[in-house]
Amino acid sequence: MKKIGVVLSGCGVYDGAEIHESVIALLAIDRAGAQAVCMAPNVDQMHVVNHVTGEEATGEKRNVLVESARIARGEIKDISTVKAEDIDALVFPGGFGAAKNLSSFAVKGENCDVHPEVLRLVKEFAAKQKPQAVLCIAPAMMAKIYEDAPKKPVLTIGNDKETSGKIEIMGSRHQDCSARDFVLDEENKIVSTPAYMLGQSISEVAEGIEKTINELIKLIP
């Protein structure tokens, strides 16, 4: 059975992994007959956001691995224990966690940093030419990782000019795309879809993510 790593960044759109995107990806992996292997870094979140008010919950702390375990129903690994040889493909759901906890894109834009274990695993995947999928805002993080790579990726976050502009400053090429579709970079084996960066409904987002996961699995030798 093919093993698909799913890198989570917490639990909740404003400070962690986007829950709809994560669950849709997990469902699509299962429907395709593959096994999802959930993982997350064992670090504190950048901050905690009250999802009712949208305001920062001052003084509160949450751990990315512990929060991600909610989505994974407890079946989750510390990303530091995972190597590229352990899995066949990799998926990064979106949500602000990808831009706050897996990277600092939400704060630093094109000058962001990427969590060292995320950076390591993606670079291992690139070296082994294994396929990866990035959803929603996660392509911005991928653009940073590939900033110094000889082959720059083609990515999509939909059609947001500010974010796509930052992706292109980092050297990647942005391609506009609807939430119901995906962009395939065959050379780098990276599939991306806008998800909630553009989608207005869960069904619209699901269509794009399901297509993305199916395309990702096709790329596995």
What are these regions (language model features)?
Residues M1-F125, A140-T156, S164-P221:
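Extended, subdomain-level signal for the structured scaffold at the beginning of enzyme domains
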Residues K128:
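Short helix-loop-beta connector
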Residues V134-A138:
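Short, thiol/selenol-centered motifs that function as redox-active sites or metal-ligating centers
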